[in-house]
Structures are given as C-alpha cells and as structure tokens.
C-alpha cells in the first residue's frame, strides 16, 4: 500500500500558486518532467500523478494550503473544474455540492 501523501512531501515535489491554482514541478520525477513544468493533465478535472498515485489537483491544493486532506467534497465556486485557485475552492457536503450543479439544457 502506498504511503499517505503529506503536506510536507507535497511541498517538496510541487509548488502551488493559490492565485492561479497552477501546480508546477520542483523536482524531476521522470524523463518527461522538467523543473518548472506545469503539473497535471486535463480531463473532467485536473489530475496529477504523484508517487505512483493519481490525485485530483483541487484536493492537492487543499492539502497544500491547509495541511490536511479535505474531509468533505471540494466544490468549485465558479463551476469551472479546471480553476483550482484557492479562492475558488470550498469544502462542502455532498448535498451542498449538488446545489451547484447547473440546469440541464435538454
């Protein structure tokens, strides 16, 4: 089983800009990664592979900023799942998060 990622370890490997929500590499983790490169790839959310595990960037942002893993869901205030700026993230219950789902257009 993989060792749980800590804030200390996260900060050794990645830099997080709370204003832009962008993570960049502080160390080379593979031949394809250069120091200063933007970390992660875009899907439904931004994902970052770190220490053999795949993480959602918004959850890493929470750990980076507050030192603990979120105990609830993380909601993006503006509904943009790629905007991981700290001001755009809030910890919510599942039911609170459902209120932020847009109305279907069909």
Description of each model-found segment:
Residues 13, 18, 49-106:
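Short, cationic Gly/His-enriched loop motifs
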Residues 1-50, 54, 103-104:
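Short helix-coil boundary/hinge micro-motifs
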């Amino acid at each position: 089983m993989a060792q749980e990622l800590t804030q200390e370890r996260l900060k050794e490997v990645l830099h997080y800009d709370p204003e832009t929500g962008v993570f960049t590499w502080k160390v080379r983790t593979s031949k394809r990664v250069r120091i200063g490169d933007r970390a992660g790839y875009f899907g439904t959310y931004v994902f970052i592979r770190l220490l053999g595990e795949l993480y959602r960037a918004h959850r890493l942002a929470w750990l980076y900023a507050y030192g603990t893993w979120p105990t609830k869901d993380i909601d993006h205030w503006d509904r943009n799942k790629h905007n991981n700026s700290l001001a755009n993230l809030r910890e919510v219950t599942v039911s609170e998060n459902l209120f932020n789902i847009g109305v279907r257009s069909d």
